[in-house]
Swiss-Prot record:
Keywords of this entry: Signal
Originating organism: Bacillus subtilis (strain 168)
Coiled coil: none
Gene from which the chain derives: ywmB
TM region(s), chain numbering: none
Lineage: superkingdom: Bacteria
InterPro entries registered for this protein in UniProt: DUF1779, YwmB-like_sf
Protein name as catalogued: Uncharacterized protein YwmB
């Protein structure tokens, strides 16, 4: 009788483990990258301070076409404050808008190089906030809809979250970085480890988009920095972008 009870208990335990694993898999598949990152950071006791979403569209505009597009953007996004900056061999139009109530800022940036042949141009759209939204999923999906309206096509969205760990926690940076990797079922492809800084480039099958390093696919970056004894531990998690363009 006892053997049967033990056997039944083992079967039930295995079934429960299977159900929980399936639930987590289904739950993760329903989440946007922004929501997955936020939930993963929160499970690792990271308090989120700021989040940013970026989208970019490559274009090819002459100087005349650049100004024509700027006029269209100004008419469509009248709530934005616009400035035009001319640099050495480049011209930029930057539009900014701030939702003070929700501590959220928006930026549109149109850039083109001043070349006679094959000018390089791109349009950037960015949303940044210091507030935690009611729904990470809804926020990401709203941004997707906005990018479709701006770019008139589906583009890749880049995600970045900045946060911090409790100053009183005894943190080993590399260990915490590996725990964050595990949250996203990611594997490291490149890393830099210093006494007060850890940076990891990684790849996860959770998301379709990726960029290539010299040898590997990469679609996740994790960085942790400590200010030293008693200092704040900062954490950044995001999908890889060419930051100099932003």
């Amino acid at each position: 009788m006892k053997k049967k009870q033990v056997s039944h208990a083992i079967i039930i335990s295995v079934m429960l483990s299977f159900v929980i694993a399936v639930f987590h898999t289904i739950h993760a598949s329903e989440l946007t990258p922004l929501a997955q990152m936020a939930e993963g950071m929160e499970r690792q006791d990271v308090s989120i301070d700021k989040w940013t979403l970026h989208a970019k569209q490559n274009l090819s505009l002459t100087e005349k076409e650049f100004y024509q597009k700027v006029q269209r953007l100004k008419q469509e996004y009248r709530q934005y404050d616009w400035v035009i900056a001319r640099e050495d061999k480049m011209i930029k139009a930057i539009g900014t808008y701030t939702d003070k109530k929700n501590r959220t800022s928006f930026r549109l940036q149109l850039v083109t190089t001043l070349k006679k042949h094959n000018p390089t141009s791109y349009l950037l759209y960015e949303q940044m906030s210091l507030e935690t939204p009611d729904s990470w999923n809804d926020t990401y999906e709203q941004f997707e809809r906005e990018t479709l309206g701006i770019f008139q096509e589906k583009v890749v969205i880049f995600t970045c979250l900045n946060g911090h760990l409790d100053d009183n926690m005894n943190i080993v940076l590399q260990k915490k970085a590996n725990q964050l990797l595990n949250e996203f079922q990611a594997r490291s492809v490149e890393h830099v480890v210093e006494p007060n800084f850890v940076s990891i480039s990684a790849f996860t099958d959770e998301w379709e988009e990726y960029i290539m390093t010299s040898k590997h696919k990469m679609n996740l970056q994790i960085a942790l920095r400590s200010a030293g004894m008693g200092g704040k531990h900062t954490v950044t998690v995001g999908t890889p972008i060419v930051t100099t363009e932003y």
